[in-house]
Amino acid sequence: MSVVSKGLENVIIKVTNLTFIDGEKGILRYRGYNIEDLVNYGSYEETIYLMLYGKLPTKKELNDLKAKLNEEYEVPQEVLDTIYLMPKEADAIGLLEVGTAALASIDKNFKWKENDKEKAISIIAKMATLVANVYRRKEGNKPRIPEPSDSFAKSFLLASFAREPTTDEINAMDKALILYTDHEVPASTTAALVAASTLSDMYSSLTAALAALKGPLHGGAAEEAFKQFIEIGDPNRVQNWFNDKVVNQKNRLMGFGHRVYKTYDPRAKIFKKLALTLIERNADARRYFEIAQKLEELGIKQFSSKGIYPNTDFYSGIVFYALGFPVYMFTALFALSRTLGWLAHIIEYVEEQHRLIRPRALYVGPEYQEYVSIDKR
């Protein structure tokens, strides 16, 4: 008997060694390592190696990985031209899709199972270039390629803003990249897997993921959560706003609730701490943080009995805003981080358990209808 699972809830489409989630206890692990340990003691580059190769790197392996990233920031001029030909008012994820598709069209010699992991590292570096230049295009600035450095986060921030980032900014960006790296198989990862299952190339699979990420119920949630803080504007208005919008009008509190977690999202706790390291030098970010804190208290009081708590998108926008990024870039920053997770999943699927993903639909329409000519209708 066929069973319809709306939203594919509780449907397992692959086995994985990548990410473990315990939604009841609020546990998230990459390859067996707690997210808290990776954030507190590791780096994004170490996470790249871990996700692709299955273990933490030695010093030599880490240095080799950093060298590879530094070599791969360059993208063909035609790709940058494609982004800059678009109007700066264009949607950031739309621009990123354009750039990613352009790379797919140029890389004509791609073949699966030929240096897949090395190819993934190259793509991760190039995505940093694309995301930085999506921001620069929308701000009306000239193209800029990330400069080689000892930190992926530093190279990305320097390319984006054309200024030397502070230690706190580099640290926050690095940790944000780790936090958004992977989360099993949400909509965007599923979209990437469907594309990769046809043996489409990696770039095209990422384009499919970006299309899914764009939606406000997935990657766009950080933008929507932050827009709430902007709308409230003043910490003293939080209570009235909450009563009006959430309690009376029954609007969804963005940044709250998760399909998997029935407790506080462990990533949200870390993003909240990261925000505290950045807001002291940014009055607006500090004000939005105060609003978020008060909104969190009201939200937990209202919804915790239903297992609804802050998710990763609730505080991440404040971190990105404090780093200097406007709201329109939040989803693109999510994509920069999640590129690693997408690639790790599609490589794992194609190399170890490849099968064309082809689900069925349960037909509930009429059994048979006799065709009636247009003159007799």
UniProtKB/Swiss-Prot annotation:
Database matches in Pfam families: Citrate_synt
Active site, UniProt feature: 258, 313
Catalytic activity: oxaloacetate + acetyl-CoA + H2O = citrate + CoA + H(+)
InterPro entries registered for this protein in UniProt: 2-MeCitrate/Citrate_synth_II, Cit_synThplmales, Citrate_synth-like_lrg_a-sub, Citrate_synth-like_sm_a-sub, Citrate_synthase, Citrate_synthase_AS, Citrate_synthase_bac-typ, Citrate_synthase_sf
One annotated Gene Ontology cellular component of this protein: cytoplasm
Pathway entry: Carbohydrate metabolism; tricarboxylic acid cycle; isocitrate from oxaloacetate: step 1/2
Family: Belongs to the citrate synthase family.
Protein name: Citrate synthase
Protein's organism: Saccharolobus solfataricus (strain ATCC 35092 / DSM 1617 / JCM 11322 / P2) (Sulfolobus solfataricus)
Source organism phylogeny: Archaea, Thermoproteota, Thermoprotei, Sulfolobales, Sulfolobaceae
